[in-house]
A protein has these predicted regions:
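Nucleotide-activated chemistry modules centered on ATP-dependent adenylation/adenylyltransferase
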Residues: 1-156
Length: 156
C-alpha cells in the first residue's frame, strides 16, 4: 500500500532536513519551496539550491517579492500555509505540513494553530524537539548546504 502524499512547505534546505527525514517514515513527501518573503532573488536561489541537495521532489512557487507587505511573523506563516494548502487542493495531495518548526526561533504552537485553522489536512509538528534543530545543523553541514543566518523576511 502506498503512503499518503504530503506537501511540505519549506523556505530553506537546512530547515527541511529533519522534517523530510521524520515525515518520510509515514508519508510520501514533496517539498513546496516558497520564498516571497526573501529579500532578493539571489537569496531565493541560494536557498533553493540548498534544498535540491536534500531532495529532487520539489515544487517551486515563483518568486514574487515585489508585492511583499507583511508586517509580522504570524501573517507570513499564514500566507505560506494558505499557499501550501492551495497547492494541496490543486495537485491532489492528502496532507500538508511545514518545516518552519525546525527553527528554535519559531513558535511551533502558533504555527500549528495557524495550520489547523486552515485545514484539518494540516499535520502539526515541532521538528526542533528531540534535538531536531541540532540534527538539522549536522545534516546540512554533511550535505554542504548554504545555511542562512536569518529568516529572510524584510518588513516594509
Amino acid at each position: 500500500m502506498s503512503k499518503p502524499r504530503l506537501l511540505l512547505a519549506v523556505c530553506c534546505g537546512p530547515g527541511a532536513t529533519v522534517a523530510v527525514d521524520r515525515l518520510a517514515v509515514d508519508y510520501d513527501v514533496t517539498c513546496l519551496f516558497w520564498g516571497d518573503n526573501l529579500d532578493s532573488q539571489e537569496e531565493f536561489n541560494r536557498r533553493l539550491e540548498a534544498l535540491y541537495l536534500l531532495t529532487d521532489k520539489v515544487i517551486v512557487h515563483p518568486y514574487h517579492h515585489e508585492n511583499w507587505e507583511v508586517e509580522n511573523c504570524a501573517r507570513c506563516i499564514t500566507l505560506r500555509l494558505q499557499n501550501a494548502f492551495e497547492y494541496v487542493q490543486k495537485l491532489g495531495f492528502d496532507y500538508f505540513a511545514t518545516s518552519l518548526t525546525t527553527s528554535p526561533h519559531k513558535n511551533a504552537t502558533l504555527i500549528n494553530q495557524i495550520g489547523a485553522s486552515i485545514s484539518d489536512r494540516y499535520v502539526p509538528s515541532d521538528f526542533k524537539k528531540q534535538d531536531g534543530f541540532k540534527r538539522s545543523v549536522e545534516l546540512s553541514k554533511q550535505l554542504k548546504m548554504y545555511r542562512q543566518n536569518y529568516c529572510g523576511c524584510v518588513k516594509p
